[in-house]
């Protein structure tokens, strides 16, 4: 990424490239986490752009992350989907790892759905459970909003009193009840990785209020909320 350019210029440059390739932009985006890229099979794809072709985009180095920005219809909804995300442990700065979320906002996305595979710590959870993220604990050593703040993007000191939309959580619970889907809810702990947690760390994270732990999601949510986007998060345990 060309760091000598102004951050706003980088965002605008990338958004302009995507707009030229795609045309009409959706209002909803999904970030597909580890092992969740199979959802793409249910998208009627109109345009798919490899990350390697998008100016200023990082390229995912993680196995299981294909690295494509997809535009198409999921059911009746026109969406943008990131098939593969960028992690702090890969060596990117927080600004680089969350750059796609900045671009989404520039393109007009208002609602962001984030997903991940997480380690469950709540004894009531079973492997394969779906957990709505209702809050998070940020244990990353770097913050995505550290450094110069651009008022055009959001405030210097954004509120995080509702990182995950209460409205969307309520809607998800209603749908799960209608379809008899087992749905859990809890707090996601975000850590740097790439090592998995020690038994002592698991006990610590549980004691401070965590229900699941993973190496992503939190930075993207912080950046999305900084820009006023509505966010819904889901972990696969």
Feature locations, PLM:
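Zn-dependent metallopeptidase/amidohydrolase metal-coordination segment
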Residues: 215-237
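Generic non-transmembrane alpha-helical segments
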Residues: 17, 21, 167, 171-182
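Non-catalytic positions within long, well-ordered alpha-helices that form the structural scaffold/packing
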Residues: 104-108, 206, 225
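Active-site/ligand-binding-proximal alpha/beta "capping" segment
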Residues: 174-211
């Amino acid at each position: 990424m060309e760091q000598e350019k102004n951050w706003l210029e980088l965002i605008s440059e990338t958004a302009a490239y995507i707009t030229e390739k795609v045309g009409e932009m959706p209002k909803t985006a999904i970030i597909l986490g580890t092992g969740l890229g199979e959802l793409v099979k249910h998208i009627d794809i109109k345009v798919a752009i490899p990350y390697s072709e998008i100016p200023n985009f990082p390229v995912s180095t993680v196995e299981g992350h294909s690295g494509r920005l997809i535009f198409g219809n999921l059911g009746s909804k026109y969406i943008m989907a990131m098939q593969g995300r960028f992690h702090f442990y890969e060596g990117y700065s927080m600004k680089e790892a969350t750059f796609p979320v900045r671009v989404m906002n520039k393109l007009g996305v208002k609602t962001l759905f984030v997903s991940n595979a997480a380690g469950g710590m709540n004894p009531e959870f079973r492997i394969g459970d779906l957990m709505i993220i209702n809050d998070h604990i940020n244990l990353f050593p770097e913050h995505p909003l550290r450094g110069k703040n651009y008022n055009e993007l959001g405030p210097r000191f954004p509120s995080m009193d509702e990182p995950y939309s209460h409205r969307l959580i309520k809607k998800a619970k209603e749908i799960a009840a209608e379809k008899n889907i087992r749905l859990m809810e809890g707090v996601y702990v975000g850590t740097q990785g790439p090592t998995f947690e020690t038994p002592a760390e698991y006990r610590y994270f549980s004691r401070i209020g965590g229900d699941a732990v993973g190496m992503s999601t939190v930075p993207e949510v912080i950046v999305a909320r900084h820009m006023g986007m509505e966010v819904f998060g889901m972990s696969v345990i």
